[in-house]
């Protein structure tokens, strides 16, 4: 039996059942990776200070940070691919949505035509219909307000 305290929304949605984090490197290495991956101007001192502050604070509000996190997510999760909507899902895939807030991110799973999620150490729950508004592009629940990043996750091979 899985201990639900050992995984968060990312571990649940990606079905790794581990605690998921975006920032996995030392701060200075993470900042360097962001500038290299996104080909940002290293001489833009304002941008550099903003990115350093975001990484050191664990923030995600800067669009460059969000883009970097999505790129890293796709690199770390080979069974994941970006999609525009859930009509693109294949038979062996389920949907994953990701949004960012100021200092947090949240994943939602779309499987068998139902949305579900897991908050921190709480148990996963199916989302009520009225909560589906979070998944609308203009929806803003005051916590997660970024663009919605949608993905198709290929189910694990059962050998």
Segments predicted by a language model, with ranges:
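Amphipathic alpha-helical interface segments
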Residues: 27-51
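Eukaryotic N-terminal accessory cofactor-binding modules
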Residues: 37-40, 58, 154-156
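Residues that form generic nucleotide/phosphate-binding pockets
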Residues: 12, 16, 37, 72-77
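Active-site nucleophilic cysteine motif
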Residues: 2-21, 25, 62-67, 104
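...with weaker cross-activation on analogous glycine-rich loops/strands in unrelated enzymes
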Residues: 42-122
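Active-site or metal-binding loop neighborhoods of secreted/extracellular toxin and effector enzymes
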Residues: 114-159
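Generic structural signal for residues positioned in beta-strands
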Residues: 11-12, 95-96, 114, 149-150
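Surface-exposed patches in mature extracellular/periplasmic domains of secreted proteins
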Residues: 21-31, 83-89
């Amino acid at each position: 039996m899985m201990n639900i305290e050992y995984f968060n929304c990312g571990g649940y949605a990606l079905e790794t059942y581990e605690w998921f984090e975006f920032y996995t490197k030392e701060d200075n290495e993470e900042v360097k990776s962001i500038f290299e991956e996104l080909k940002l101007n290293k001489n833009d001192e304002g941008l550099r200070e903003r990115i350093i502050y975001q990484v050191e604070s664990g923030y995600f509000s800067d669009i460059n940070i969000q883009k970097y996190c999505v790129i890293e997510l796709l690199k770390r999760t080979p069974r994941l691919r970006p999609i525009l909507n859930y009509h693109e899902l294949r038979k062996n895939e389920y949907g994953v949505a990701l949004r960012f807030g100021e200092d947090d991110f949240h994943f939602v799973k779309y499987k068998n035509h139902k949305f579900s999620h897991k908050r921190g150490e709480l148990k996963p729950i199916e989302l009520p219909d009225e909560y589906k508004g979070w998944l609308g592009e203009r929806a803003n629940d005051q916590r997660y307000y970024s663009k919605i990043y949608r993905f198709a996750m290929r189910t694990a091979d059962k050998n």
